[in-house]
Amino acid sequence: MSAEKITQSKDGLNVPNEPIIPFIIGDGIGPDIWKAASRVIDAAVEKAYNGEKRIEWKEVLAGQKAYDETGEWLPQETLETIKEYLIAVKGPLTTPIGGGIRSLNVALRQELDLFTCLRPVRWFKGVPSPVKRPEDVDMVIFRENTEDIYAGIEFKQGTSEVKKVIDFLQNEMGATNIRFPETSGIGIKPVSKEGTERLVRAAIQYALDNNRKSVTLVHKGNIMKFTEGSFKQWGYDLAHNEFGDKVFTWQQYDEIVEQKGKDAANEAQSKAEQEGKIIIKDSIADIFLQQILTRPAEHDVVATMNLNGDYISDALAAQVGGIGIAPGANINYETGHAIFEATHGTAPKYAGLNKVNPSSEILSSVLMLEHLGWQEAADKITDSIEATIASKIVTYDFARLMDGAKEVSTSDFADELIKNIR
């Protein structure tokens, strides 16, 4: 068996039995969690496919290791390799200190146009949680990754650039509500129809493919009408135009209320649910953040913009055990490019101590296996994590919050996971 590249066709990914997958080991605790994660992935693939499939890992450089070896934080060769091989796994990366140097994570997303930040959030039995019913949390967040206020179009207070922007807004556009123009920094919030449509399309298709019940469009369109309000409307339009008979939208519901009354609308939605149609609804962001605490079971797949998605993903992660067990992926569903990554930082004070929880990196690799269509291997890892946590053999972050837990190192936790792969 010889290793081959994953390729993309109009029908999706073409995954050989021995794909070559680049990995970025990461900074700080990156080496510790990668050693653990890669062993668990390899063991699950071996167990699931009896040696008929395996991954050939190919290291590429980014972050501190790249800078030390090449003088560049994100070498062009790394970008070209990921572009060529489509799929990659990465650990946490240090953001270089110094003006004008952007986050390496953001740079990777923008260079590869990874427009979806995918963040599934669910609870594993036994994981300590601050909420009463963490088992009600089972959501998949589709966060737009390339636009919004995170696009990085900012002008610092006091510069000639910001003065030009403010002068233009006031004198050319008639903006009179910049409260303190002499001392303001300015940020630009682009939200496009195309960017919205490709995100919402991916979210609805995911819901259909994975037997989910609804997609919630989360926005602050009541205040930001031409950006977040447009996101909501474009999302509804896309659902109606491209998924017609597979979805039932709240806008359809409102139309039926107007024409036939609320009872008829409730009946139509109930019928749609019985037929397995995806319910497309929306929620204002601040109300949504309350609902994920008070009644999280009402939401399933969530599609939202960049800033909202950042808040929502980490708020939900806190309800199920924190970002130490929160997986993430950055995906372009059109080109096939995807990077699967731990969602936490580099935690430099724990670097090399063999102490931290590798679950975020491992579960991100589960997302990768699912993305490749290797569901059997993915399920084996998920089942093993459930069994291991239920047996209270955990790393320090959980052990300190669980009665009767046995605290183990990063590598010992990986050993336990491998032992529990059935």
Curated annotation (Swiss-Prot):
Critical for catalysis (site feature) positions: Y150, K220
Annotated positions binding NADP(+): T94, H344, G345, T346, A347, P348, K349, Y350, N357, Y396, R400
GO biological process, one term: tricarboxylic acid cycle
Positions of D-threo-isocitrate binding: S103, N105, R109, R119, R143
Required cofactor(s): Mg(2+); Mn(2+)
Cofactor binding notes: Binds 1 Mg(2+) or Mn(2+) ion per subunit.
GO MF annotation list: isocitrate dehydrogenase (NADP+) activity; magnesium ion binding; NAD binding
Reactions listed under catalytic activity: D-threo-isocitrate + NADP(+) = 2-oxoglutarate + CO2 + NADPH
UniProt cross-references to SUPFAM superfamilies, sorted A to Z: Isocitrate/Isopropylmalate dehydrogenase-like
EC numbers for this chain: 1.1.1.42
Gene3D superfamilies in alphabetical order: Isopropylmalate Dehydrogenase
UniProt keyword terms in alphabetical order: Glyoxylate bypass, Magnesium, Manganese, Metal-binding, NADP, Oxidoreductase, Tricarboxylic acid cycle
InterPro entries named among the record's database cross-references: IsoCit/isopropylmalate_DH_CS (IPR019818), Isocitrate_DH_NADP_dimer_prok (IPR004439), IsoPropMal-DH-like_dom (IPR024084)
PROSITE patterns membership: IDH_IMDH
Binding positions for Mg(2+) per the UniProt entry: D310
Class of enzymatic activity (EC top level): oxidoreductase
Summary of the function given for this chain in its UniProt record: Catalyzes the oxidative decarboxylation of isocitrate to 2-oxoglutarate and carbon dioxide with the concomitant reduction of NADP(+).
PANTHER family: ISOCITRATE DEHYDROGENASE [NADP] (PTHR43504:SF1)
Assembly mode: Homodimer.
Family: Belongs to the isocitrate and isopropylmalate dehydrogenases family.
Name of this protein: Isocitrate dehydrogenase [NADP]
